[in-house]
Design a protein with these regions (language model features):
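Extreme N-terminal tail/first-helix region
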Residues: 1-21
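Short, helix-capping/interhelical loops that line the mouth of catalytic, cofactor-
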Residues: 1-5, 50-116
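Pocket-edge positions in alpha/beta enzyme catalytic cores
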Residues: 5-8, 30, 95, 122
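Amphipathic, well-ordered alpha-helical segments in soluble domains
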Residues: 12-19, 41, 45, 102, ...
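Hydrophobic packing residues in well-ordered alpha-helices of helical domains and bundles
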Residues: 13, 35, 96-103, 131-134
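General secondary-structure edge motif
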Residues: 18-19, 83, 121-122
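Short, contiguous alpha-helical
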Residues: 24-73, 112-151
């Protein structure tokens, strides 16, 4: 685990934006991405999982086996160093507040959807498993930003 990274887990989408708002008050970056880049990436992935056509093909060698999927869903830990899909890598210079609002909108969009329709490296997933996966993914990236403001 990257030194300085915080232990973080979300049980509900309702926990995500209060954490982001706390980070906007002050934080230390311990990974490679800024808070704006993290928010941009997370928003893009949430939207991608809802609207990417189900007919999109993926490399079968990129699949996660059932044991890895089960372990990730049980532990809530997503390994570091997994490559992001094309189009989900954030630009270098972004506005934190703007991208935080984009993440808020993407979370609402995802929650209002009937469920992700995309093929994915960890398929098949139930809707509850998809929600769990997204919460794990959100916490994974947000854990690289450590709040400096007192609660």
């Amino acid at each position: 685990m990257t030194p300085g990274r915080r232990t973080l887990g979300y049980e509900s989408f309702d926990e995500v934006m209060p954490d982001v708002e706390r980070l906007l008050q002050g934080h230390t970056q311990v990974g490679n991405w800024t808070l704006a880049q993290i928010c941009r990436h997370l928003g893009a992935i949430l939207r991608r999982h809802v609207y990417l056509p189900a007919s999109t093909t993926f490399d079968p060698s990129d699949r996660v086996c059932e044991d890895q999927k089960r372990r990730m869903l049980e532990t809530g830990i997503l390994p570091e160093g997994i490559d992001a899909p094309p189009g989900a890598m954030p630009e270098a210079t972004l506005s934190e507040a703007e991208k935080a609002e984009g993440l808020r909108a993407a979370i609402a969009y995802f929650r209002a959807s009937p469920g992700p329709v995309t093929d994915h490296r960890i398929l098949p997933l139930t809707r509850d498993e998809w929600d769990r996966f997204e919460l794990i993914h959100l916490a994974h990236h947000q854990s690289f930003a450590v709040p400096t403001a007192a609660d």
